[in-house]
């Protein structure tokens, strides 16, 4: 019933607003609710209905479809894309199976380890997978993590960031993807167990074990150590997919020493491609090589799927600059277009940019910073560049000249005829 105005002024039991502050106040047994709280409840229920409907109609893309979308964003790495597509498809099929209530066969979770040089596309692969599947995604740097109780970041903070990516929707977060970069940097310092505490190496591996395997973690919504009295969010990590990545510099030497396949003979022949040799060596990777590198057996056991990424050559880097949907050159061209200017990057300049990235050994990651540096002055004066064309040549990349700025001529009908007549006059 609606509370009469002549009675003692009452308040909403949910938002504490007084009767005169709202349009309606509905009474129940010893409680009251205002029209604003009713509308809020209806909005929440409507949103949950949309999520439920989306879950019902959602279909997992096939490995071929996943790989096809990856091809739109990631250049090369065909084997890695195939492995990831199959692994991710099987992971989310497993989730469907678990949610259906079937338990005749227990399907284990298969987390993934990506091994590849800096700038080879490990992070981009993980990000693109999350985008394809429309699931929450977060990244963490393993080098910033420490065991609980030490200065640094708790592993629970990774789960907090995933919750934030899911807008604190626990059910959604529990189906997300977590990418942990630079796991090679948390390798223990010695192959033999140490009597001293290794809080940023083996200690972090131990801390990651439980959440990677599957546990109900207590996640502090405000970040943990600074707010010890806060309520915790319970998050089940059993169905969260963990993808770990690292460069693992030097692991090729460990593989070579195990297989007694010395590269000295190869090095003597200058015609042999060293990168090709390294690719072949990495194909022989075994669990014992990762153990010798410094990962503990229990941690390796949580990462049953291991795949390697190749070094990117000049041709691949040029393709990355121009072909993908989010290609760097396309992005900069669009930025200039928004300011009514035009950007031209010559083919020879693209090759020079790729060569520069190879020389710096930054892979695809270094391409953007090179172009940012080349275009800094032009972008700084972009307001003056309306109806202007900025051209980047090979000499510009090499630092010999500044970017070439010319006018964009948009002739009228009359001037077009005059220009055509002039062009017809023989030189």
Curated annotation (Swiss-Prot):
Membrane spanning residue stretches: none
GO MF entry, a single one: ATP-dependent protein folding chaperone
SUPFAM superfamilies linked: Glucocorticoid receptor-like (DNA-binding domain) (SSF57716), P-loop containing nucleoside triphosphate hydrolases (SSF52540)
Record's GO cellular component terms: HslUV protease complex
Signal peptide: none
Top-level taxon: Bacteria
Gene3D superfamilies the UniProt entry points to: 1.10.8.60, ClpX chaperone, C4-type zinc finger domain (6.20.220.10), P-loop containing nucleotide triphosphate hydrolases (3.40.50.300)
Pfam families reported in the protein's UniProt record: AAA_2, ClpB_D2-small, zf-C4_ClpX
Domain ClpX-type ZB: 1-53
GO biological process assignments: cell division; proteolysis involved in protein catabolic process
Chain residues that bind Zn(2+): 12, 15, 34, 37
UniProt keyword Manganese present: no
InterPro entries associated with the record: AAA+_ATPase (IPR003593), ATP-dep_Clp_protease_ClpX (IPR050052), ATPase_AAA_core (IPR003959), Clp_ATPase_C (IPR019489), Clp_protease_ATP-bd_su_ClpX (IPR004487), ClpX_bact (IPR046425), P-loop_NTPase (IPR027417), Znf_CppX_C4 (IPR010603)
Residues bound to ATP: 117-124
Alphabetical keyword list: ATP-binding, Chaperone, Metal-binding, Nucleotide-binding, Zinc
Stated role: ATP-dependent specificity component of the Clp protease. It directs the protease to specific substrates. Can perform chaperone functions in the absence of ClpP.
NCBIfam families on file: clpX, PRK05342.1
Quaternary structure and interacting proteins, as annotated: Component of the ClpX-ClpP complex. Forms a hexameric ring that, in the presence of ATP, binds to fourteen ClpP subunits assembled into a disk-like structure with a central cavity, resembling the structure of eukaryotic proteasomes.
Family membership noted in the UniProt record: Belongs to the ClpX chaperone family.
Protein name listed in UniProt: ATP-dependent Clp protease ATP-binding subunit ClpX
Organism for this UniProt entry: Rickettsia bellii (strain RML369-C)
Gene: clpX
